């Protein structure tokens, strides 16, 4: 009897040691279709169509904490993509970190979402597969939402206000360059407001080179003094959801050929949704105003509409149906794209 009790006690020790470790994730897959029509000088010059079974952002992660005493905790997370299409490789390719949390707030180091990326849920409430992200998601404003190898501090909430600062060293950022990030949040009785800013010495991009009869896209430091400012506000009472967002980005082209010319664009977006029992219909609209490229006016305007609905089978399983329309440019030279998707999701 004593041996049985000892064996039972020893078997329980690993469970107790892992009591603060949580396994979580989501499996998302579905079917998507897309069509893109390019117009040049008023005539159709290119048409692309397709349909496929795709992954819509599946992931798996582990997170935990340890009580260090005196109100201090060690916190950690290891998260990675887990595509049902078998396209993800490696550990920690999503937000992963280790840090300390206490009355002073939270400080973390690792691969961390920026404040811009944190506001993304209130700018883009949609999901897409590999080839439909530019149409089924509010992708124009999301271009500067990244994850950085960095250190980040998040303050405690005080009277509805909270803030964050983040720093990514240049030696960790590759083509992204040294960057500074700041965020400010406010929430009260369902109302919320967010500001996120990015300040970057060199901006990211790609350039194409030809070698051995092949064309390659490589990272290119082609913009400098990049600034992105985003304001988001809205209301959410778990039934009615409304949000509006505005973003302005400004940079200079880098290099002798460009003469450090000025580049900028302003974008806006809005989303509304209302929950009827298990069904939540939603609609989003986004617009990119005419900006400047190479210090000259440039018709990089766009208009986008996404509509759809979610159906909750349970707290963990849901389905999403969505359709999107995107037009880049106007008049005789434009690209008109449409896409649709039916997605099944399960969270654990």
From Swiss-Prot:
Keyword line: Cell outer membrane, Ion transport, Membrane, Porin, Signal, Transmembrane, Transmembrane beta strand, Transport
Pfam family, one: Porin_1
Keyword ATP-binding in annotation: no
Compartments where located: Cell outer membrane
Membrane topology reported for the UniProt record: Multi-pass membrane protein
One CC-aspect GO term: pore complex
Stored CDD domains: gram_neg_porins
Major localization listed first in the record, in broad terms: membrane
GO molecular function: porin activity
Family: Belongs to the Gram-negative porin family.
Subunit structure: Homotrimer.
Function field: Serves as a slightly cation selective porin. Major antigen on the gonococcal cell surface and it may have pathogenic properties in addition to its porin activity.
Identification of the protein by name: Major outer membrane protein P.IB
Name of the gene this protein is made from: porB
